[in-house]
């Protein structure tokens, strides 16, 4: 990789609500090459990226972030400048009924991404190494509920 090339952004969970919005906006800028990793689960919306899928700066990888070998292969072959991790099991009520899939995806999947990203980061040199970023996007659910008598915060 070199600085005169377009920046490559690898996004997980790109067919989700936030991920698809991010990709639609980012795809308008031809200075970015976009990779989208998504397992395509119940919360994926294939229609959300219908105007993006045929663009030259977009590639889709249907994969589970829990598949360590595939995730490593995607990262090393795509050679991203930035990884934006949005993939997660959502809907708190579902986590109460079946926590295993939440633990697997949200913890093990994130761990796999971090390990492969670290390995990739240690491989790249020069400015690409200095510019590389890994961004984890979470949810407001991690803060818990705000009681009605508590002061609001942002």
Regions found by a protein language model. Name each.
Residues 1-154:
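N-terminal Rossmann-like NAD(P)+-binding domain of SDR-like oxidoreductases, especially those catalyzing
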């Amino acid at each position: 990789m070199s600085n005169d090339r377009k920046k490559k952004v690898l996004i997980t969970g790109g067919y989700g609500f936030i991920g698809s919005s991010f990709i639609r906006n980012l795809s308008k800028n031809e200075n970015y090459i976009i990779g989208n990793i998504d397992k395509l689960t119940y919360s994926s919306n294939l229609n959300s990226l219908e105007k993006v899928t045929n663009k030259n700066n977009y590639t889709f990888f249907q994969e589970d972030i829990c598949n360590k070998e595939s995730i490593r292969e995607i990262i090393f072959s795509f050679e991203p400048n930035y990884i934006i991790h949005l993939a997660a099991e959502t809907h708190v009520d579902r986590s109460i009924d079946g926590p295993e899939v939440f633990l697997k995806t949200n913890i093990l999947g994130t761990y796999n991404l971090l390990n492969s990203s670290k390995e990739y980061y240690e491989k790249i040199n020069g400015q690409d190494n200095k510019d590389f970023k890994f961004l984890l996007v979470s949810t407001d659910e991690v803060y818990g509920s705000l009681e009605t008598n508590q002061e609001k915060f942002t």
